């Protein structure tokens, strides 16, 4: 049963209110809380003994959405979930994932999700994933999420991936890999906020394997208090391709940030670029907002929201 806390989590991580007409699978506390398929999108339980689901999207499916959020509302729960996506040729679909934890006690709650995408030819896929954690007042249980995502993009297809870590995740280790065929494109936007003593490590690999393949990574992060972030994006060009990695971070308090982008060209026709910048909030930006009547804290919050938008 979905209670008030569950509903608030679903709204935060998937912008989900009520029951949509789209394909849907809500996983709650390691069980299936709700599921519905559509004429063109089928969601089924795995048959190989692993926890998770298979999502099959028929060729030619356009304008449809698929919601697959995960919520945890217990303390001490740990799970490993495997979701496989099979997306046919000539599709145009949105997939909305995400995980929210409401930890009610002092034990660690943890979700490890392994997603594998098989995208056919000439398709467009928009994938959105938000992570959020919170605790009952006075409780200290850790909230941990470790997503692994591997995407195989067929010829002429495009994937746009938007990942957001909103707040409240004590530890996360992310691994993301894209294998791009000729004429395909991937655009990744990663937004990350850490605070307190939180730690976040993100490894990303984009393999541009065919002529005309393109890959772009835009990473924006804010590290506050005593938190730690490490971002290691790698772009490998094996053909006449284009890759661009841009990492921008704001550091505050006693936080630490390590950004180590890498590019590898295995073809004379590969064009690869990487950029990385880490800095604090400029004093003149704060002053400008403070002269408009904002407090120092309000000015900081306004700048950070704009940076992570």
Question: What are the functions of these language-model segments?
Answer:
Residues 1, 288, 297-298:
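Sequence-level preference for short, compositionally simple segments enriched
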Residues 1-26, 30:
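C-terminal functional modules
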Residues 25-28, 33-294, 304-309:
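Conserved beta-strand/loop scaffold segments within soluble protein domains that form the structured core
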